[in-house]
Amino acid sequence: MKKRTRKKLRTLWCLLLVPVVLTGCRIRTTPMGVFAQILEYAGQNNSQASSSHGHGTYHTESQPSSTPIPQMDYDSLDAIGEVQTIMVYLVGSDLESDYGNASLDLDEMETAGVDIAHNNILVYAGGASEWQDRGLSSDECTVLLLTDTGFVPVDTYPAENMGDPLTLSGFLNYGFDFFPADSYSLILWDHGGGPVLGYGVDENFRDLLTLDELSEALEDSVGAHMTKLEWIGFDACLMSSLEVASVLAPYANYMIASQETEPGWGWNYDFLSELSDEVIPGD
């Protein structure tokens, strides 16, 4: 009887999982292939992730970047901290290596007309086996800052596992420490697998961030700074759920996410035009 019950439960679990898998995760990818990757990565241990701990990415003031950010090299940084810092955690994955979608969204951010005197748009780019544009290397993770001439690299590190919570918390701490502002927000860009599988597919380290790891990363950065993000946005599929919201609630006032799939090219970043110099901050 027990064996029969267990068999029924396994069958039910498979039937429940199939519709999720078939929906895919970003239309321009192969649905079964993407979720096979996510399921595989979710089942692996973090032996590769542990090898990257403490190296490369900025973590705390006691462990500074080996190449301090040359922030005063850019005139556009003179007014840092007046309004807000938006941090974009850009896990390129096959969305970039196969389709160039991450590069496309960086183009959209550049042409949105952001008032860079009052808004810091900071990107941490990695997790792709190849970059179609931008001259980025799969052997590195790169910090990009939006300036009046477009994105410029302000810091680079040896390739970090973007499915490691230490990498995400390191990037957030980097933003807090070097780009102080009145408010902060975070965009998480890549594949999403919902509350069961988590977010992000780093195709170099074959790893992703589970909800527990997202919570760990936020606690070690947002929580440690005793601040709260204005919003966290998932430019990723399937991340709008009560389970995800409950994890983010202590760390952000708002969550922006989709309960369904998204197109491969993700959000239309023209919405950043609301941060143009024609818009009065606070209105």
Predicted regions and their residues:
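Bacterial N-terminal signal peptides that target proteins for export
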Residues: K3-W13
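N-terminal extension/subdomain marker
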Residues: V34, L39-P180
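Solvent-exposed loop/turn segments at secondary-structure junctions
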Residues: G92-E96, G127-W131, D190-V196, E203-D207, ...
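A short, glycine/acidic-enriched catalytic loop
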Residues: V152, G192-A224
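Active-site-proximal C-terminal subdomain of hydrolase catalytic domains
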Residues: T227-D283
